[in-house]
A protein has these predicted regions:
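Short, small/polar residue-rich loop motifs at catalytic or cofactor-binding pockets
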Residues: 18-20, 41-44, 62-66, 84-86, ...
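Short, ordered secondary-structure scaffold segments
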Residues: 49-50, 58-59, 64-82, 87-102, ...
Length: 300
């Protein structure tokens, strides 16, 4: 920490000598930069610019702009954002629910992403969405307990405990008759071929996280830190390692495979799940910047 008690550096160390260090600088009480360093050396530096105390721009090494807020509405919600050569526009209704999300490259008339949404402002449920690029739309309805009852013209039904009995996209029913386990499926009349017949064996840690998952000779094993956060995953088949993945700092991943290694640093966001850009280094040892398009839930 610095003399004012502010975080000045943070190092997260995983297994196998992998680590991620973040060094912070400040200006006017706001974080002005974060430098990322790993076992590979210095990765990059994020620089932040503010207006009236609000973040308005993020740059890489004080050069490449990967996030720039250009417009917001009266509720303080972003309506226009620039990410490099990409323009992102967001629409909202009078309650602040999203109505549209678009991504367009500068100088190009077509959209990389063009989504529309409608929400029930009282129950806050999504009732309609459309992907204009592929001309696909979905309508949703819910019961008085906010459970999904229809989607894409299909129906879902529930028992008194809230268990799903039928789903329109699956031919068959589900039963929950195991004594002492009212929410565990005891049987299903789903047709053969819809559900996998492969046996999957899962073991757990003392803090109820998966320790290993085995299926068809494939084994995925997991390692956690003292905060019960996953820091390593290893996938193997027949004793041969297929993939080792390390997770660090909520923003850095390392993939090691027999064919080569890859590093990914997620940027312009709080963590993996809301970052709008990712810096990737593959086996050629060169870094490339990619931008991420997400829906309103954060899914890519």
């Amino acid at each position: 920490y610095d003399a004012l008690g502010r975080l000045s550096s943070q190092t997260e160390t995983a297994v196998d000598n992998k680590y991620l260090r973040k060094d912070y600088t400040y200006n006017g009480g706001n974080v002005s930069s974060i430098k990322y360093t790993s076992q590979s050396g210095v990765l990059t530096t994020e620089n932040y610019n503010y207006a009236n105390g609000h973040l308005v721009e993020t740059k890489l090494n004080n050069q490449t702009s990967i996030f720039k807020l250009t417009k917001e509405n009266d509720m303080g919600l972003p309506t226009e954002v620039r990410s490099g050569a990409l323009s992102r526009t967001y629409g909202y209704d009078s309650y602040g629910f999203p109505t549209s999300r678009k991504i367009q490259k500068t100088g190009v008339t077509t959209f990389l992403q063009n989504m529309e949404y409608v929400f029930d402002p009282v129950k806050r449920n999504l009732t309609y969405r459309k992907d204009i690029n592929v001309s696909q739309e979905e309508k949703f309805s819910y019961d008085n307990l906010n459970r999904l009852t229809s989607y894409k013209g299909l129906m879902a039904t529930y028992d008194a405990k809230g268990n799903i009995l039928t789903k329109g996209d699956v031919s068959g029913t589900f039963a929950y008759n195991t004594s002492g386990k009212p929410y565990a499926i005891s049987s299903s009349s789903v047709a053969n071929g819809i559900m996998s017949s492969a046996t999957q064996v899962i073991s757990y840690t003392s803090f109820k996280r998966p320790n290993a998952i085995t299926q068809d000779g494939n084994v995925a094993s997991f390692t956690y830190n003292g905060n019960q956060q996953r820091v390593k995953m290893q996938v193997a088949k027949g004793g041969s390692r297929l993939l080792t993945r390390y997770y660090l700092g909520d923003c850095y991943e390392i993939d090691e495979t027999p064919s080569g290694n890859k590093e990914k640093l997620y940027l312009a966001g709080e963590n993996y799940y809301d970052a709008s850009a990712v810096l990737v280094k593959d086996h050629t040892n060169s870094w490339k910047l990619y931008y991420i398009g997400r829906d309103y839930l954060g899914s890519i």
